[in-house]
């Protein structure tokens, strides 16, 4: 995948040129080998120098924003202080150019480059996540030009070295400043950093070697996937410029809420409402489980509100091992809100026989009362 140049500098993709420059200057002061001799800092300094070079160049930044890597396959030429930049890089960030006549050249980026990875978001219901599913999807992507087969040229013509940059892919300018002679490099405006031009381009792809098209792809989603997980389809992304190798296609799963079950990892949770009498005497209820069909659940006599009955191995399959999680059934005891005369009489009789049962006030911090259970649920304490 393409390197995260924005992340290396700690800026967002929408950062302005000034914000990128400030971020690089701050990091350069901290990590430059003349200031910080630590090997890890030196490696980091090299990375941020490359990131700044890419993001400070409009064309290279455009390639990054499209999901590519402008330095992919580029040959590094020249160097500075010990192979990791040098003072010229820092002065370039501070003052807008090289220092003392030195500059770092990366060479042409190459006409044939790897393609970008693509991302497809797919909505799945809980049953599809549990069983796995194969779906046909249509994607708009870059494919190999079927007229020139990726060459980008018309007929038997071929690319030729760029006259403007002499095939180097960049042009340099020298200016005088208070710091002395300042040399700056930028991508060649004629060949856009590639180093070659196509005098007679393909009429279908206009020299790019690829065209936009809609493709139908079969996507196999394995059993046990969860929300936010990505399935990788190798070489199913965009074909690269000049007919370069295709990137990968990533299918990101978005699991839709279920009417009954709530998923927690490989475990499932649901709630059953049990009448007060059944909670006291015991009963059997049925639940239509995701993979097991209708399952019977025994409510033991004397079940209290908030009790949890666990069915081992009745949850979701694990993505890799296939072992099943658990199904946790939360019991909600329903107290009748309206009673007729006969119901009232029977309950009063029952109360009379249970005279020892009286209301009791207890601390909410002990004993597992409702408040305690709620607090534990939401805070873990």
From Swiss-Prot:
HAMAP family: DnaJ (MF_01152). Participates actively in the response to hyperosmotic and heat shock by preventing the aggregation of stress-denatured proteins and by disaggregating proteins, also in an autonomous, DnaK-independent fashion. Unfolded proteins bind initially to DnaJ; upon interaction with the DnaJ-bound protein, DnaK hydrolyzes its bound ATP, resulting in the formation of a stable complex. GrpE releases ADP from DnaK; ATP binding to DnaK triggers the release of the substrate protein, thus completing the reaction cycle. Residues 4-68 form the J domain. This is Chaperone protein DnaJ 1. It comes from Mycolicibacterium paratuberculosis (strain ATCC BAA-968 / K-10) (Mycobacterium paratuberculosis). GO terms for molecular function: ATP binding; heat shock protein binding; unfolded protein binding; zinc ion binding. Its main location: cytoplasm. The keyword Protein transport does not apply. Belongs to the DnaJ family.
């Amino acid at each position: 995948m393409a390197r995260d140049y924005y992340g290396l500098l700690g800026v967002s993709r929408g950062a302005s040129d000034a914000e990128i420059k400030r971020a690089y200057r701050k990091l350069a002061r901290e990590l430059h080998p003349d200031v910080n001799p630590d090997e890890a800092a030196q490696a980091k300094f090299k990375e941020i120098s490359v990131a700044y070079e890419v993001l400070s160049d409009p064309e290279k930044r455009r390639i990054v924003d499209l999901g590519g890597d402008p330095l992919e396959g580029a040959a590094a030429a020249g160097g500075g202080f010990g192979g990791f930049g040098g003072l010229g890089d820092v002065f370039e960030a501070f003052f807008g150019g090289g220092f003392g006549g030195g500059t770092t050249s990366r060479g042409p980026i190459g006409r044939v480059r790897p393609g970008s990875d693509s991302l497809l978001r797919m909505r799945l219901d809980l049953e599809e996540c549990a069983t796995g599913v194969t779906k046909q999807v249509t994607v708009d992507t870059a494919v190999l030009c079927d007229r020139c087969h990726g060459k980008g040229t018309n007929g038997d013509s071929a690319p030729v070295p760029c006259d403007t940059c002499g095939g180097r892919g960049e042009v340099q300018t020298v200016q005088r400043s208070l710091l002395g002679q300042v040399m700056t490099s930028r991508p060649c405006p004629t060949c856009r950093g590639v180093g070659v031009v196509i005098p007679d381009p393909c009429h279908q792809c206009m020299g790019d070697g690829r065209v936009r098209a809609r493709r139908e792809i079969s996507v196999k989603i394995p059993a046990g996937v969860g929300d936010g997980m990505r399935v990788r389809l190798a070489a199913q992304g965009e074909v690269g410029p000049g007919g370069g190798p295709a990137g990968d296609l990533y299918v990101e799963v978005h699991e839709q809420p279920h009417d009954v079950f709530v998923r927690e990892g490989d475990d499932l949770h649901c709630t059953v409402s049990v009448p007060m009498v059944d909670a006291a005497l015991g009963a059997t209820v049925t639940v239509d489980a995701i993979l097991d069909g209708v399952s019977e659940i025994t409510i033991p006599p004397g079940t209290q509100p908030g009790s949890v009955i666990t069915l081992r191995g009745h949850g979701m399959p694990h993505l890799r091992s296939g072992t099943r999680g658990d199904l946790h059934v939360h019991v909600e005891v329903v107290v009748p809100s309206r009673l007729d005369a006969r119901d009232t009489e029977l309950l009063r009789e029952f109360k009379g026989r249970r005279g020892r049962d009286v209301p009791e006030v207890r601390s909410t911090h002990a004993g597992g009362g409702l408040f305690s259970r709620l607090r534990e649920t939401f805070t873990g304490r």
